[in-house]
A protein has these predicted regions:
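Flexible glycan-contacting loops in extracellular carbohydrate-active proteins
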Residues: 248-277
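Beta-strand-rich interaction surfaces with strong enrichment in secreted/lumenal proteins
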Residues: 126-134, 210-215, 247
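Short tryptophan-centered beta-strand motifs in secreted/extracellular beta-sheet-rich domains
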Residues: 62, 141-143, 220-228, 233-235
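Short, aromatic/His-centered strand-loop micro-motif at the edge of beta-sheets
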Residues: 198-221
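Short strand-turn-strand beta-turns centered on an Asx-Gly dipeptide
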Residues: 237-239
Length: 316
């Protein structure tokens, strides 16, 4: 069973045009998932231009100082602050978006999405971070993501959803497209957790989608991959294929990538609690199916060269 469609997703985000300069990249290395993590500069630094690199490639290791870092927006990212759903309506906030050092992350740094609630709408903050270029279509989407099975603080039991998904910029688009990884450690909508839902959408309203569920605890780091080529979408977790969709359940227009951490409902009050989701890095290769091994080899090469950001995907 997949989630009910996330309705009333209002957006007020703009596409940023970025200059490009030459950046020499070291050769890719097939070594282990490691690398040096340079500290991000302060929020007052000047935003750097887009480096060049392998064609049709997006990579970000999330080396930013915070949600107000000018390089975050210059690199085409936006932290959501508008209204609407999914989850607890009108609770989207930049407060939960951070980029702390993390010894468990490749390169020693990750993006943290921390949602919090005390069981009331007024005491709830959800977090979502997305690209704004609307230029990602077919190809390979990959991200190293840390899921949480229990809150970082407070009582367990919330129906939290930790997600990675490419999606159309408008829910009402005639060519609506959405491809979901959704982890529900405690279940939701009447289902029992833990569960990882993969969902391919054709239409948002009325909902028209296909899905498959993996019932397994996934606390920790995982490599999530979506390959959308040749009229087929394949979802994989740590190199294992989970689900394939085809026919009308494939991308039909260019999308943005989103990461979000949100609550389905508020099942109880009685004290604050926080839930963490982390993203080590994100990678996209346009129009090509890339294996897990080659994705990791390319990412290792970026880290080895000290390259934290690449975007050579043609603009819309």
């Amino acid at each position: 069973m997949s989630q009910p469609r996330r309705t009333s997703r209002r957006r007020a985000w703009t596409v940023l045009t970025l200059p490009a300069v030459l950046c020499v990249l070291a050769a890719c290395s097939g070594g282990p998932a490691s690398g040096s993590g340079d500290d991000a500069a302060g929020p007052g630094r000047k935003a750097s231009p887009t480096p060049s690199g392998p064609p049709g490639t997006l990579f970000d290791a999330f080396h930013y100082s915070g949600a107000d870092d000018p390089e975050l927006s210059a690199h085409g990212w936006q932290v959501r602050t508008d209204g609407g759903g999914p989850g607890i309506k009108d609770t989207w906030s930049t407060a939960g978006a951070g980029f702390p050092s993390d010894p468990t992350a490749q390169g020693g740094r990750a993006m943290q999405l921390q949602s919090s609630t005390d069981g009331t709408q007024q005491g709830t903050k959800q977090v979502e971070v997305q690209t704004t270029g609307t230029n990602l279509f077919t190809g390979t989407f990959a991200a190293r993501v840390h899921f949480s099975d229990k809150p970082a603080s407070g009582r367990n039991g919330d129906h939290v959803v930790q997600t990675f998904f490419p999606i159309s910029p408008s829910d009402s688009s005639a060519n609506y497209s959405e491809l979901d990884f959704e982890y529900l450690p405690n279940g939701g909508w009447g289902s029992v957790g833990p569960r990882l839902d993969n969902v391919s959408w054709f239409k948002a309203d009325p909902p028209d989608r296909v899905n498959k569920t993996l019932k397994q605890r996934l606390e920790g780091w995982h490599l999530l991959m979506i390959t959308a080529v040749d009229g087929k979408v394949t979802y994989a977790l740590d190199g294992k294929e989970l689900f394939t969709s085809s026919g009308k359940y494939v991308p039909r227009e260019k999308m943005n990538v989103h990461f979000s951490n949100w609550f389905i409902d508020l099942p109880f009050t009685g004290g604050p609690r926080t839930w963490d989701m982390k993203v080590n890095w994100v990678y996209y290769k346009a129009d090509q199916a890339v294996s897990q091994a080659d994705v990791q080899k390319t990412v290792d090469g970026f880290y080895g060269a000290g390259t934290h950001y690449v975007n050579t995907v043609p603009k819309s």
